[in-house]
C-alpha cells in the first residue's frame, strides 16, 4: 500500500506540478497578452488616431470638393438657363426679322410688278398713238394721192398745188 500511496502521491504531485505548470503558463500568457495590449495599445491607439485623422481629412476634402462641384453645377445650370433664354429671344427676333424681310421682299416685288405693268401700259399706249399716227398719215397720203389723181385729170397744175397745200395745212391743223 505504501507503493500505491507513493504512486498516488507521485501521480498527485505530477498532476499538481502539471497543473501548476499549466496555471503558470496561463498566467504567463495572460501577462504577455496584457503587456502586449498595454504596450501595443499606445501604438494601436496612435495608428487608429492617425487613421481617424486621415479619414476625417479625406471626408472634409471630399465634402469640400462636393460643395465646389455643387457650386459649379449650380453655375452651369444657371448658364444653361440663361443660354436657353437667350436662344429663345434670338429665335423670336429671327422670326420677326424674317417676317419683316419677307414683307419687304413682297412689297418690293409688288412695286416692281406695278412698275412693269405701268411701263407696259405706257409702251402700249405710245405704240397705239404711233400706229394711229402712221395709219392717219397713210390715210392722208392715200387721200392726197387720190385727190391728186382726180385733180390732175380735171385741174391745172397751179390750182392743184394750191388745193394740195390747203388740204395739207388743214390736215396738219386737225391732227
Curated annotation (Swiss-Prot):
Organism: Cyanidium caldarium
InterPro entries: ATP_synth_b/b'su_bac/chlpt
Molecular function, one GO term: ATP binding
Transmembrane annotation, as ranges: 21-40
Originating gene: atpF
Family under the similarity heading: Belongs to the ATPase B chain family.
Record keywords, A-Z: ATP synthesis, ATP-binding, CF(0), Chloroplast, Hydrogen ion transport, Ion transport, Membrane, Nucleotide-binding, Plastid, Thylakoid, Transmembrane, Transmembrane helix, Transport
Function recorded in the entry: F(1)F(0) ATP synthase produces ATP from ADP in the presence of a proton or sodium gradient. F-type ATPases consist of two structural domains, F(1) containing the extramembraneous catalytic core and F(0) containing the membrane proton channel, linked together by a central stalk and a peripheral stalk. During catalysis, ATP synthesis in the catalytic domain of F(1) is coupled via a rotary mechanism of the central stalk subunits to proton translocation. Component of the F(0) channel, it forms part of the peripheral stalk, linking F(1) to F(0).
Assembly and oligomerization: F-type ATPases have 2 components, F(1) - the catalytic core - and F(0) - the membrane proton channel. F(1) has five subunits: alpha(3), beta(3), gamma(1), delta(1), epsilon(1). F(0) has four main subunits: a(1), b(1), b'(1) and c(10-14). The alpha and beta chains form an alternating ring which encloses part of the gamma chain. F(1) is attached to F(0) by a central stalk formed by the gamma and epsilon chains, while a peripheral stalk is formed by the delta, b and b' chains.
HAMAP family hit by this protein: ATP_synth_b_bprime
Pfam families with a match to the protein in the record: ATP-synt_B
Further information: In plastids the F-type ATPase is also known as CF(1)CF(0).
An annotated GO cellular component: proton-transporting ATP synthase complex
Primary location: plastid
Domain of life from the UniProt record: Eukaryota
Presence of keyword Electron transport: no
Compartments it resides in: Plastid, Chloroplast thylakoid membrane
Coiled coil: none
Topological relation to the membrane, as annotated: Single-pass membrane protein
The protein's name in its UniProt record: ATP synthase subunit b, chloroplastic
Amino acid at each position: 500500500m505504501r507503493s500505491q500511496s507513493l504512486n498516488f502521491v507521485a501521480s498527485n504531485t505530477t498532476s499538481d506540478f502539471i497543473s501548476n505548470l499549466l496555471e503558470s503558463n496561463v498566467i504567463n500568457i495572460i501577462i504577455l497578452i496584457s503587456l502586449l495590449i498595454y504596450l501595443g495599445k499606445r501604438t494601436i491607439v496612435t495608428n487608429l488616431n492617425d487613421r481617424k485623422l486621415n479619414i476625417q481629412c479625406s471626408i472634409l476634402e471630399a465634402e469640400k470638393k462636393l460643395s465646389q462641384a455643387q457650386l459649379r453645377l449650380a453655375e452651369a445650370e444657371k448658364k444653361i438657363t440663361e443660354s436657353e433664354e437667350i436662344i429663345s429671344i434670338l429665335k423670336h427676333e429671327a422670326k420677326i426679322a424674317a417676317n419683316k424681310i419677307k414683307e419687304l421682299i413682297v412689297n418690293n416685288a409688288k412695286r416692281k410688278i406695278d412698275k412693269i405693268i405701268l411701263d407696259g401700259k405706257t409702251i402700249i399706249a405710245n405704240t397705239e398713238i404711233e400706229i394711229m399716227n402712221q395709219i392717219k398719215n397713210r390715210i392722208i397720203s392715200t387721200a392726197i394721192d387720190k385727190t391728186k389723181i382726180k385733180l390732175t385729170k380735171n385741174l391745172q397744175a397751179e390750182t392743184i398745188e394750191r388745193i394740195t397745200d390747203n388740204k395739207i395745212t388743214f390736215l396738219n391743223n386737225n391732227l
